[in-house]
Amino acid sequence: MTNDPAEISSRKRRHIDVCLNDEVNYVGVTTGLERYRLPFNALTQTSLADIDLSAEFFGAPLRAPVLIGAMTGGAELSAMINRNLATAAQRLGIGMMLGSQRIMLDDARGQRAASSFAVREVAPDVLLIGNIGLAQLTKAAVPAVAAALRRVGANALAVHANSLQEAMQHGGDTDFSGSLGRLRDAADLLDYPVLLKEVGHGIGAAAVAQLLRLPGGLPVSGIDVAGAGGTSWSRVEQLVRYGELRYPELADWGIPTAEAIVEVRQALPAVPLVASGGIRTGMDAAKSIALGADVVAIARPLLAPAIESATAVQDWLQLFLDELRVCLHCCGAPDLTSLRDIGVTAIR
């Protein structure tokens, strides 16, 4: 792939346009959350006003179990989007992931793009997670990655594994050989918690087994399953590259979010776990947490509000959180721990 910051910036803008204007959801593939029912308790003994949504992730307190998912950075429009997202996160006491910071690794023109990730001024207290691609995470790149994280004031690093997206992208990084070893080495060298994530095609049992076979065991501090059922980045990249779907079967390939949550939680009972990929409602969040996730992440539904204003983002998220609170109340869970204890019922 080209390392030209101008080309990266142009592609980022095309990503935004396609996600706003085209149908980029999976077709015929769902999150799988509809196959579970949150038990309804007609005799709940909770008070809606007293429901406690507070959570903790990577040692940071959150007023609700929500992260704003990784979206953008490097395009001219990205700065406004990220500042509006970060402002809403600060107001609501939730976390935020930045979009890929690859463009910041360039020594020259890439530095101009760094301003699109600069959100600490409006979000001084937010759990802020930086972002780099697994394909770019070489040992030689670690000092530049660390510098990029320091520059934005990040608390942690998300490393996105996106082999299918890269395969669909013009000039994409398609050599992932040795990437597990590089991930282990980078995690050892970086003084930040590392969150391994997909981009919407899912992390499941097979990937976790590969991680656990590495010398020293699991090299990361947490997993974001980023499952199938929401935005398909294989679909996005095909639309950006060709203006149409050349490979429709590849546009709808992935591990559904619910399946990914269950598989990863079974393999890693105590590791911080993010549920993302098609999380659209408070009920989706409640089911995901009941299945074992610690927090959920939401991305594309916030893109259009973020172009409008921070208040529009806040309003969207407040409705989401209000629904989540009612879900806990009406299943008799005063807090998130109780929600996990109650669990969900599989629909046969």
UniProtKB/Swiss-Prot annotation:
Gene Ontology terms: cellular component: cytoplasm
Coiled coil: none
Residues annotated for FMN binding in this entry: A70, M71, T72, S100, N131, K197, T231, G278, I279, R280, A299, R300
Amino-acid positions noted as binding substrate in the UniProt annotation, renumbered to this chain: R11, K12, S100, Q101, R102, Q165
Signal peptide coordinates: none
One of the Pfam families matching this protein, by short name: FMN_dh
Reactions that this protein is recorded to catalyse: isopentenyl diphosphate = dimethylallyl diphosphate
GO molecular function (one): magnesium ion binding
Positions contributing to Mg(2+) binding: E166
Gene3D superfamilies attached to this UniProt entry: Aldolase class I
Assembly information from the UniProt record: Homooctamer. Dimer of tetramers.
Official protein name in the record: Isopentenyl-diphosphate delta-isomerase
Organism of this sequence: Mycobacterium ulcerans (strain Agy99)
